[in-house]
Amino acid sequence: IADLSTAAQNQTYTVRGVITADYRYANGFSGFYVQTPDTKARANISNAIFVYIPNSSAVKGGQVGDEVILRGRLTTYQNQLQLDQLQQDIQTCNSNMANQVQPISLELPFASLTGGSTHSPQRYQGMLVKLPQTLTVSENYNYGRYGELSLSLGRLYIPTNLYPALSPEAKALAQKNLLSKIIFDDGYNNQNRTPWLPTNFSAANTLRSGYQLKNAEGILEYRFNGWRVQPVLGRNQPEVITQTNPRQSVITKNANHIRVASFNVLNYDNGATGFP
């Protein structure tokens, strides 16, 4: 599989590897990842690739843990190599290979976001990885809609909050922030799903910025202009640590203090009866 990184595209190739993650389910990614067993893997290069099988395809076969042989066209989609246009069912060679591909330890920060470094995300693209560090939820803006969390080494600060705009220090911190974070996704392709972390998610049990995650693992991929880890069904879920960002208790009201209240009418829409 590693040879595909330099192979001519729009050509047909036959590959053999172990299925590490299968996203052929409703609102999934219509395909799966296949990776070379650890004993045959090459160093400092990706040993995995995504196999795209659209919902309209009649091709079937293979499940997580199977070593398979398949033949497809090599192409690039959203800056990620993939095999598509499979014409035959997937052939299973060995159905007991799940333990032959172990997650690779992936630590932040990256040395680079391009392929010029042995510790760049491109080096691990499509592979099964684990994040051994305790990472902080630095952004949850897209969590409710897309199931995305930005994880980082500690809290990240906007560079111009600390340094003058366009200063060398601000530019250096901006670059450091980019190398020190990664998106942890939910493995689905549709919007507005029920958030899956923490367990029993609710208004009283939500996931806030400043919380931490331990032992996250999944497939490292590039999607929607960002490096992210997609969870794998059946593998361990990350541990959510909430005690690191405690909320202040309610302050007792002082009768001598004045409280100021306001009401935002910017989005106070009351139908077709005019405004207000």
Q: What are the roles of these predicted feature ranges?
A:
Residues I1-P276:
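Extended non-catalytic accessory segments flanking core domains
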